[in-house]
Amino acid sequence: MYKVTVVIALLFLGSSLGFAQQDSIDVGVYYHPNATEEISQKEEEEIKNCLSDFLLSLQPGQNRSKTIDRSDFGLNYGFINQAQYSYAHKSSTHFKPGISFVKKIDDDTFEVKISFISATETPVLKFIHALLLKRMSDGLLSVFSTFERNTSTWNRQVVGNITYVYKDSIGFDHQRAIEMYEFSSQLAVLFGCEPIAINYYKFRNPVDLFQNIGLDYITNQYFGEMGGFALQSKRMILAANNSEYYPHELCHIYTHQNRGGNSFNPYADEGLATYLGGSGELSLAKILQYTEEVFLTDDKDTFVEFKSLYSRMPNDINFAYGISGLLVENLHREYGFEAVKELLYSGDTFESYLAVINKYLHITEANFDGRVRQLLKEYNRRNNK
C-alpha cells in the first residue's frame, strides 16, 4: 500500500430517515462567491440546510442517520468525518466547509463541490469533495456518493470469483486477472474457506481513483504514482496501479471476512498482506533486503521504529509492514498458519500483538531490537542470495 492510507468507516444505524435537526448549532457551512448562479434562493437554502444537518450528524455525540448509513457512503464518509471531527473539537487544524460550486442536474438532483479549508492563521485547502444531493419521497434532500454515477457505464468482466470494473480506455489484461484469481484461491485454502467474491475497480493512478470516488482534490493523490485500498466489509478493491493484480489488498479482504467475532490486529494484518502480497511494487524479500542494507542503521532502535505502524522508509514502504511480514513469515514457517491466525485475531492493540510474538518467537520489548535484527539477517541470507 502506498503513501495514502485510507481508513474507511461505515456509520451506525440511526433512528430516523432524515438528518438530525440541531438548529442551535452552526457547523459553519457557507457559500463561496458565485457558487449558486444556477439555482434559486429556495434551493440555495435547502442545500445549505441539508449539508449542515449532514455534517452535524457526523460529529461525535450526535444522532446518526440511516440516510447516511447506506452502502454507497463508505466511499467518502471517512474524509468528511475526519474534517468535521476536527472542526467540532476546534483543533489547530479544523476545517471550514465551503460550498464552492453547485450544478443543478434536475429539479430534484444537485451536484455539490465542498472545499475544506483549514481554519488557521494561514488557511490551507485540504480537499475538495463532490457529493450528490437527491430529493427523497418526503421532499427533503439527502446526500449520496458520486462513485456509482461516475462508474455506471464502465466495463465489467468476471474472472473466477472477481468482477473487474474498468474504463474502455484503460483496457484489460486477462492473464493478470487469472493470476489474481489463482492468488485468491490460494488464500482460500490458507483460511479454509471458499474463494471470496470481490469487486475490483481498476484505475490508472491515485488521481484517477480519488476523483472517481468523489475527491476532486486531496494532496495525497499526488504523493505516488500507484496505490489503492480495500473496503473490506464491502469486499471491494480500489486499485490505482493500472493493473488487474493487487494481492496486498486482497489479503485484507480475506483477513476481514474470516475474523468471525474477533477483532484483528492491524500490525498482523499488514504483516500478512506484506508477507504474501508485498507492498507497493516490492516483494517482502526486496523490502527486507532494503531494510537491512539501507534503512536499519546501527543508530536506529528497531522497537521504536516498529511501533509507528505508518512511518515510511525513504523507499516509500512502511517499516512496520516489512518487519511484521518478517515475523509472520517466521510464524508460518515454524508453527503453521494457525499460529498466524492467532496473531491476526489477537486483538487490536500493539500489546496483544507483542504477546503472541513473545509466546512463539520469544520476542519481548527488551530484546526486540536484537532478535529482529537477527531474524532479518537470517531471512536475507535465505532469500536474497
Predicted segment positions?
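Positively charged n-region of N-terminal signal peptides that target proteins for export
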Residues: 1-4, 20
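Sec-dependent N-terminal signal peptides
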Residues: 4-15
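Non-catalytic architectural context of zinc metalloproteases
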Residues: 21-50, 58, 62, 69-178, ...
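Soluble non-cytosolic domains of exported or imported proteins
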Residues: 37-49, 170-181, 237-245, 262-267, ...
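Extracytoplasmic/secreted envelope proteins and their assembly/folding machinery
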Residues: 48-52, 177-184, 188, 247, ...
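Juxtacatalytic substrate-recognition/specificity segment
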Residues: 154-264, 352-356
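Acidic/His/Gly-enriched intrinsically disordered linker/tail segments
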Residues: 261-385
